[in-house]
């Protein structure tokens, strides 16, 4: 596994300047004051648009000058392989040209639409656009992997699940979300539900793969049944590899016989038991991602693309808006 500084793992300076003022549809992206400087620092260290990482010897290795993705325009990418994950979710592996890496900053997402804008529209006749967070690492060469759950009422997910190997999907990005910096926090809590695991997985794999990481992570991951747990083997492999840095807690609404973990909805008691206290102040960060109802209950509703006011159980427990981020 490669070890590299978080500040050198980003896209080019010009891409970030554009991405900071663009959204994935018609709205602007979140304008947190700290986001742009951190992203630009990563691009600036790399020089004039050159991406590099540090290998195990500490030597910088230049790999490519820019990401094959475009934060301003949709580009078609060929579907290389489909790997079924469970009864309603599959991994969609897209081919990146010239064996290039995506170079996505952490945390960020992509937005997708049909390669034929006329093929997937909403009731107002506008192309349907949806955000997804890749599960493949930014340095992965030649491939970009999306883990996508099929929803009966989700036209975008049904369209993607209808694709065949060799078809294309229009992708735009990256869309910067939270500029995660290794060792910025002592404790990080990741509260996720269902397919909301992907941005949380992006953060924890990025951090734990860095040999200098000292942050302790706790993932509280809720699902309906055990069969619904996405990335289960990957998460358990992380827990086994980093037992002192990663605590994994599953929570099920419909547990099997003999289940010993938490059950039902995420409660105040469960959060008090597993999440680092608000009294740690700037040393703790809580990331939340899941169905809108769950996010609202845990941390308050989002306001469109903006964070919205902090609410829910986390507010009751004394956390502040600076301590919580909602994907």
Task: Please report, for each region that a protein language model flagged, where it lies by residue.
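Reductase modules of NAD(P)H-dependent flavoproteins
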Residues: 26-32, 36-53, 220-327
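Short hydrophobic alpha-helical membrane-entry/anchor segments
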Residues: 48-64
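A short, basic/flexible loop-to-alpha-helix module at the beginning of a structural domain
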Residues: 174-184
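Structural motif
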Residues: 187-189, 285
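Hydrophobic/small residue at the entry helix of a nucleotide-binding pocket
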Residues: 195-200, 294
């Amino acid at each position: 596994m490669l070890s590299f500084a978080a500040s050198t793992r980003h896209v080019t300076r010009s891409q970030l300047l554009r991405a900071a003022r663009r959204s994935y549809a018609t709205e602007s992206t979140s304008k947190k004051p700290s986001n742009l400087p951190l992203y630009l620092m990563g691009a600036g260290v790399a020089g004039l648009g050159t991406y590099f990482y540090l290998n195990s010897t500490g030597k910088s290795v230049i790999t490519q000058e820019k990401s094959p993705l475009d934060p301003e325009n949709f580009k078609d990418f060929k579907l290389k392989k489909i790997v079924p994950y469970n009864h309603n979710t599959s991994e969609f592996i897209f081919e990146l040209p010239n064996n290039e890496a995506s170079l996505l900053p952490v945390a960020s997402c992509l937005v997708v639409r049909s390669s034929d804008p006329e093929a997937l529209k909403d009731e107002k006749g506008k192309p349907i656009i949806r955000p997804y967070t890749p599960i493949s690492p930014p340095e992965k060469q030649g491939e970009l992997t999306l883990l996508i759950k099929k929803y009966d009422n989700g036209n975008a997910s049904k369209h993607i699940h209808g694709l065949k190997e060799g078809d294309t999907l229009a992708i735009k990005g990256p869309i910067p979300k939270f500029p995660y910096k290794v060792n910025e926090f002592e404790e990080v809590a990741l509260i996720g539900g269902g397919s909301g695991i992907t941005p949380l997985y992006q953060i924890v794999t990025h951090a734990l793969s860095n040999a200098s990481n000292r942050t302790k992570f706790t993932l509280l991951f809720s699902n309906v049944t055990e069969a619904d747990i996405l990335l289960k083997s990957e998460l358990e492999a992380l827990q086994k590899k980093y037992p002192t840095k990663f605590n994994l807690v599953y929570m099920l609404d419909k547990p099997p016989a003999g289940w010993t973990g938490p059950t039902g909805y995420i409660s105040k008691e469960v959060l008090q038991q597993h999440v680092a206290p608000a009294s740690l102040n700037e040393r703790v960060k809580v990331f939340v991602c899941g169905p809108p109802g769950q996010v609202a209950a845990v941390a308050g509703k989002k306001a469109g693309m903006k964070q919205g006011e902090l609410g829910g159980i986390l507010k009751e427990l004394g956390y502040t808006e600076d301590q919580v981020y909602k994907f």
